[in-house]
């Protein structure tokens, strides 16, 4: 297959710097990018004249798998109630855990696949999907099975086992023990990562450490939600654990940045959540100045019902003190780094999987400017067309 006459091709050089190639063709053979060359043609060539070809978005942090909705919380927040206020009233994560725990696998799958389809239509070609809304081992099994069914359709899915919240009326350390003794052994062979929500209203630093130790013993790669609501010392755990990414970081102090840098973790910022919760945005440049790789992800969830990575890029450029070029890098190759898949995807270069999108714009600088428009004319996952003329192909 050939993508010919590409007006602009976005990729990155060997040092990871943004690189723009104009008026070239991309040759794809056996679902792999084989060449970027002078314009070629064949009967099946896709004409990308006056369009932008770029790596598909790597949405490296999502909570897309669940049952139920939480639209009432929008109106609660509009009347001044905070995330923690809603949580303490039995809403937030607790409501979704109850809804998901009481739902069958088919219901979870049918609701989740619709959200995944929306993400794909907006240019995502690789997804991480977390569990975490099942209170019991059976609830988590239904959730993880639903995610595995989605992976059988789209292939480019990583699964994360998430210690998300302590169910109502259960002691935190008792539940951490339940998670360690039941969840991790049951699912360690079904998932790619272990994640813990370490924050006020979730897991304390001590119980987080206990869960992470069990993850290490089970040879799981680690992630952590940290410093979203308050700074309770979770980032200090970078000194002990090898995280692939540390995510949220709204309240991370400057003196803690070296812990992230020294660990080699990717710092994932989630501007759509800041928008949805009307909270402060992360200053991404603080991390970039420390030579820390920054990723952008959607954090799509019942609290922030938006998986549009183009909107995430818009918010990052507008509010997170990051250039458009670095934001695109954060939403592609750095997202791939956070999932340990950057050797095979996240950039357009020979030898990598053909995970790419063709945008119906003539200049990449219009990407965040036109964030409310349908921009993804074509999308390819592993060289297979999944969006054709703005329509999804299953």
Curated annotation (Swiss-Prot):
Its EC number is 3.5.2.7. Catalyzes the hydrolytic cleavage of the carbon-nitrogen bond in imidazolone-5-propanoate to yield N-formimidoyl-L-glutamate. It is the third step in the universal histidine degradation pathway. GO terms for biological process: L-histidine catabolic process to glutamate and formamide; L-histidine catabolic process to glutamate and formate. It holds the Pfam family Amidohydro_1. InterPro entries: Amidohydro-rel, HutI, Metal-dep_hydrolase_composite, Metal_Hydrolase. GO terms for molecular function: imidazolonepropionase activity; iron ion binding; zinc ion binding. This is Imidazolonepropionase. PANTHER family: IMIDAZOLONEPROPIONASE, IMIDAZOLONEPROPIONASE-RELATED. It catalyses: 4-imidazolone-5-propanoate + H2O = N-formimidoyl-L-glutamate. GO terms for cellular component: cytoplasm. Fe(3+) binds at residues 61, 63, 225, 299. 4-imidazolone-5-propanoate binds at residues 70, 133, 164, 228. Its main location: cytoplasm. Zn(2+) binds at residues 61, 63, 225, 299. Keywords: Cytoplasm, Histidine metabolism, Hydrolase, Iron, Metal-binding, Zinc. N-formimidoyl-L-glutamate binds at residue 133. Its cofactor is Zn(2+); Fe(3+). Binds 1 zinc or iron ion per subunit. Pathway: Amino-acid degradation; L-histidine degradation into L-glutamate; N-formimidoyl-L-glutamate from L-histidine: step 3/3. It comes from Picrophilus torridus (strain ATCC 700027 / DSM 9790 / JCM 10055 / NBRC 100828 / KAW 2/3). The keyword Nucleotidyltransferase does not apply.
């Amino acid at each position: 297959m050939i993508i010919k006459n590409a007006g602009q091709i976005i990729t990155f050089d060997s040092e990871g710097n943004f690189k723009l190639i104009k008026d070239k063709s991309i040759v794809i053979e056996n679902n792999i990018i084989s060449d970027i060359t002078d314009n070629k043609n064949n009967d099946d060539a896709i004409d990308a004249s006056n369009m932008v070809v770029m790596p598909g978005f790597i949405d490296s942090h999502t909570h897309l798998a669940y049952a139920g909705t939480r639209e009432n919380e929008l109106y609660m927040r509009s009347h001044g109630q905070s995330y923690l206020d809603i949580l303490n009233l039995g809403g937030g994560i607790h409501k979704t855990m109850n809804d998901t725990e009481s739902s069958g696998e088919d219901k979870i799958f049918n609701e989740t696949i619709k959200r995944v389809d929306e993400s794909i239509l907006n240019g995502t070609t690789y997804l991480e999907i977390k569990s975490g809304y099942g209170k019991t081992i059976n609830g988590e099994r239904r959730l993880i099975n639903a995610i595995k069914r989605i992976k059988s359709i789209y292939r480019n899915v990583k699964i994360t086992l998430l210690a998300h919240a302590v169910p109502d009326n259960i002691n935190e350390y008792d539940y951490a023990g339940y998670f360690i003794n039941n969840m991790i052994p049951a699912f360690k062979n079904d998932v790619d990562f272990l994640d813990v929500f370490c924050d006020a209203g979730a897991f304390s630093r001590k119980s987080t450490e206990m869960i992470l130790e069990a993850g290490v013993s089970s040879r799981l790669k680690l992630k952590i939600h940290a410093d979203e609501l308050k700074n309770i010392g979770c980032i200090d755990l970078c000194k002990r654990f090898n995280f692939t990414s540390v995510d949220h970081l709204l309240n991370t102090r400057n003196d803690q940045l070296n812990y992230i840098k020294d660990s080699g973790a990717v710092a994932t910022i989630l501007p759509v959540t800041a928008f949805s919760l009307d909270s402060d945005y992360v200053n991404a440049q603080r991390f970039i100045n420390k030579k820390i790789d920054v990723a952008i992800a959607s954090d799509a969830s019942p609290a922030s019902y938006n998986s549009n990575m183009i909107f995430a890029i818009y918010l990052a450029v507008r509010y997170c003190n990051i250039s458009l070029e670095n934001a695109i890098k954060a939403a592609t190759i750095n997202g791939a780094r956070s999932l340990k898949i950057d050797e095979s995807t996240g950039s357009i270069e020979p030898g990598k999987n053909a995970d790419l999108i063709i945008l119906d714009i003539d200049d990449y600088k219009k990407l965040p400017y036109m964030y409310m428009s349908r921009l993804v004319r074509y999308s390819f996952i592993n060289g297979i067309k999944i969006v054709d003329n703005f329509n999804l192909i299953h």
